[in-house]
């Protein structure tokens, strides 16, 4: 595995730009994938849309595991590739994918057995449960395919190839977009399967995408090969994987839980504020898309350079990324500040919702630059093999700062006080993370690939 994409030698800014642009397309595709499913299912009525909403906690848990395992694969493979240890990288990826399949297949089997008890516990009624069953039976079949796809794509990204995963996910989204209306509504020769059709369309798109990802990993790039059964080796590789994956998965679960607490606080003050906050968080996912694309590119870049014994280059990339995202998000805020009210009117016509959403757009994005610094630094810590530090930073932001400040703000000035607490939290944590980033260094015990 040569340095095909220049991660170890080409100009840092150019490499990160070349890696981030395809990542940007990939993330936009995933957002579009979700929106298309939601749109077509919403045409079936409120009950179908409610049924899909009930599946969110389960899909979130599976996705969080996939993101955690993907972070572990990207970090460990990046170091092995950077150190020139291609044979060990191939074996590590084999063992990581094997563990991923065993874990997700087991969880999916259990989930399919306990669909009714689990979703009844989540509050689904007798009308929603049959719809949830129809959807989740196929979703559980496809869950191992989805997670293998996500982890396999991270394997490709660890080499610096972000274009192939983006193309794969774009193709999957196109297939899903074509099949959704055909199978949901029974257009032409296709049967009308309604909510079940949405699940089948998604399953088929994942299968095609996984086939392409497997072709690239196994045949084109020769990144994966069958390894002999050796329980000691597998246990050692799984331990390295879990060291990154467990905190990363947990970190991904904390954010929606904290948002749920904020929404509960808002519900006690004004239900219109809940609607505004929900719309605001959806807008936030779009406004932070460049942050997500850059952080996804930075992790393999840092990992490869640390594996190659180039810690200074890794640190330069980190600091350059932090400065860029601060400037970019600050410039992005300027038009938002001027057009907060017209933008809010796209989401609602209710006067009270408009007032709160306009205020949200005016105050929260002003600190998306510091928030971007927090996100990128926390991601970089995984590449530095400091996943617990990454988790602690997020816990500090959400539990020690955001929630207490939000409670205090709501007590002092209701909805406005609560919302103002969020950018203040992001500003304080952004300053702290930039300070820490300037002092980061490679841990002694992780300076070589043999001691990952």
From Swiss-Prot:
Keyword Transmembrane: yes
GO CC aspect terms: plasma membrane
The keyword Transmembrane is annotated on this UniProt entry: yes
Keywords, in A-Z order: Cell inner membrane, Cell membrane, Membrane, Transmembrane, Transmembrane helix, Transport
Membrane topology: Multi-pass membrane protein
Disruption phenotype: Deletion of the gene results in a severe decrease in flavin export. Mutants lacking the gene have no defect in reduction of soluble Fe(III), but they are deficient in the rate of insoluble Fe(III) oxide reduction.
Gene Ontology terms for molecular function: antiporter activity; xenobiotic transmembrane transporter activity
Domain of life: Bacteria
Location in the cell: Cell inner membrane
Entries under InterPro entries matching the protein: MATE_fam, MdtK-like, Membrane_Transporter-Flippase
Residue ranges of the TM segments: 21-41, 49-69, 96-116, 131-151, 167-187, 199-219, 248-270, 283-303, 324-344, 357-377, 392-412, 417-437
Family stated for the protein in its record: Belongs to the multi antimicrobial extrusion (MATE) (TC 2.A.66.1) family.
Protein function: Flavin adenine dinucleotide (FAD) transporter that facilitates export of flavin electron shuttles.
Name of the protein: FAD transporter
Provenance organism: Shewanella oneidensis (strain ATCC 700550 / JCM 31522 / CIP 106686 / LMG 19005 / NCIMB 14063 / MR-1)
Lineage: Bacteria, Pseudomonadati, Pseudomonadota, Gammaproteobacteria, Alteromonadales
């Amino acid at each position: 595995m040569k340095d095909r994409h220049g991660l170890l030698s080409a100009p840092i800014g150019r490499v990160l730009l070349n890696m981030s642009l395809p990542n940007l397309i990939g993330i936009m595709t995933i957002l579009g994938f979700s929106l298309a499913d939601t749109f077509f299912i919403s045409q079936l009525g409120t009950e179908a849309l409610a049924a899909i909403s009930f599946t969110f906690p389960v899909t979130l848990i599976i996705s969080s595991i996939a993101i955690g395992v993907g972070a572990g694969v990207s970090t460990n493979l990046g170091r092995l590739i950077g150190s020139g240890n291609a044979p060990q990288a191939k074996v590590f990826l084999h063992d990581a994918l094997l563990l991923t399949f065993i874990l997700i297949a087991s969880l999916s089997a259990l989930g399919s057995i306990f669909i009714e008890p689990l979703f009844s516990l989540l509050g689904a009624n007798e009308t929603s449960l049959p719809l949830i069953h129809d959807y989740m039976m196929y979703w559980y079949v496809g869950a191992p395919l989805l997670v293998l796809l996500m982890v396999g794509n991270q394997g490709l990204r660890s080499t610096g190839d972000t274009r192939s995963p983006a193309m794969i996910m774009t193709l999957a989204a196109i297939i899903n977009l074509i099949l959704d209306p055909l199978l949901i509504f029974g257009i032409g020769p296709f049967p009308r399967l309604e909510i079940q059709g949405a699940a089948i369309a998604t399953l088929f798109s994942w299968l095609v995408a996984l086939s392409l990802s497997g072709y690239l990993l196994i045949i084109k790039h020769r990144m994966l090969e069958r390894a002999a059964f050796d329980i000691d080796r597998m246990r050692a590789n799984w331990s390295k994987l879990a060291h990154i994956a467990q905190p990363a998965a947990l970190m991904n679960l904390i954010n929606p839980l904290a948002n749920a607490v904020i929404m509960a606080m808002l519900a006690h003050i004004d239900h219109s504020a809940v609607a505004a906050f929900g719309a605001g968080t959806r807008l936030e996912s779009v406004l932070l898309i460049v942050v997500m694309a850059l952080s996804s590119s930075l992790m393999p870049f840092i990992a490869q350079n640390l594996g190659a014994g180039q810690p200074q280059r890794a640190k330069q990339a980190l600091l350059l990324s932090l400065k860029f995202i601060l400037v970019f998000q600050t410039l992005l805020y300027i038009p938002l500040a001027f057009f907060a009210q017209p933008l809010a009117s796209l989401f609602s016509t209710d006067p009270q919702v408009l007032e709160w959403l306009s205020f949200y757009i005016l105050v929260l994005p002003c600190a998306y630059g510091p928030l971007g610094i927090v996100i990128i630094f926390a991601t970089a810590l995984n590449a530095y093999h400091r996943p617990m530090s990454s988790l602690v930073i997020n816990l500090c932001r959400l539990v020690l700062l955001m929630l207490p400040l939000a409670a205090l703000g709501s007590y002092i000035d209701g909805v406005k006080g609560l919302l103002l607490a969020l950018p203040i939290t992001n500003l304080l944590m952004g300053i702290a993370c930039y300070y820490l980033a300037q002092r980061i260094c490679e841990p002694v015990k992780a300076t070589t690939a043999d001691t990952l």
